């Protein structure tokens, strides 16, 4: 098992996964990957069309995320990982992964999503929040409120 950390920064769209994950990776001295870049083209097209992904859509993507983590000596990945079963799937490939859940109010998530350009439209936020299962006490990781400066949030993780 590697001593360099493998971390997934998780949360719904707009929670700050990319910004906090990139800052955390720099702080830890490891690489950073945004799992949005690992989505199959069909998933991106589906979301751009305003349709939420289902478990069948997510399965191959989560397998890629897990494999990417498993193959890296240390890595931070920004990945929604909204449901425990998704995190379990990632952990199956990378058992030593730890999760950092970014906690942000639904109102703030909506505001952030409306102020950026992304393939995930704000209309899909409700489906993400309905899918969200907060990190369980028995899961390896921590929940962090994403308020304040990005570097401060990353260091609280």
What spans do the regions from the language model cover?
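Hydrophobic anchor at the beta1->P-loop junction of P-loop NTPases
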Residues: 9
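Walker A (P-loop) ATP-phosphate-binding motif of ABC ATPase nucleotide-binding domains
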Residues: 6
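Conserved lysine of the Walker
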Residues: 17
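Conserved phosphate-donor/acceptor-positioning beta-strand/loop module used by diverse small-molecule
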Residues: 93-112
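Conserved substrate/cofactor phosphate-moiety recognition/catalytic segment
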Residues: 22-66
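Loop/turn-to-beta-strand initiation segments
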Residues: 72-78, 98
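P-loop (Walker A) phosphate-binding loop of NTP-binding proteins
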Residues: 12
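Small-molecule kinase domains that catalyze NTP-dependent phosphoryl transfer to phosphate-bearing small molecules
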Residues: 115-156
């Amino acid at each position: 098992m590697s001593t360099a950390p493998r971390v997934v920064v998780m949360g719904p769209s707009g929670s700050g996964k990319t910004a906090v994950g990139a800052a955390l990776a720099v702080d830890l001295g490891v690489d950073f990957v945004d799992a949005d870049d690992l989505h199959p083209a069909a998933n991106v097209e589906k979301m751009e069309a305003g349709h939420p992904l289902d478990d069948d859509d997510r399965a191959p993507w989560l397998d890629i995320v897990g494999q990417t983590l498993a193959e890296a000596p240390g890595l931070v990945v920004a990945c929604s990982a909204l449901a425990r079963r998704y995190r379990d799937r990632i952990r199956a490939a990378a058992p030593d992964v730890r999760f950092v859940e970014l906690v942000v109010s639904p109102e703030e998530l909506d505001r952030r999503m409306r102020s950026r350009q992304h393939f995930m439209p704000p209309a899909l936020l409700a489906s993400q929040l309905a899918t969200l299962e907060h990190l369980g006490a028995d899961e390896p990781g921590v929940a962090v409120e994403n308020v304040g400066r990005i570097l401060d949030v990353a260091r609280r993780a």
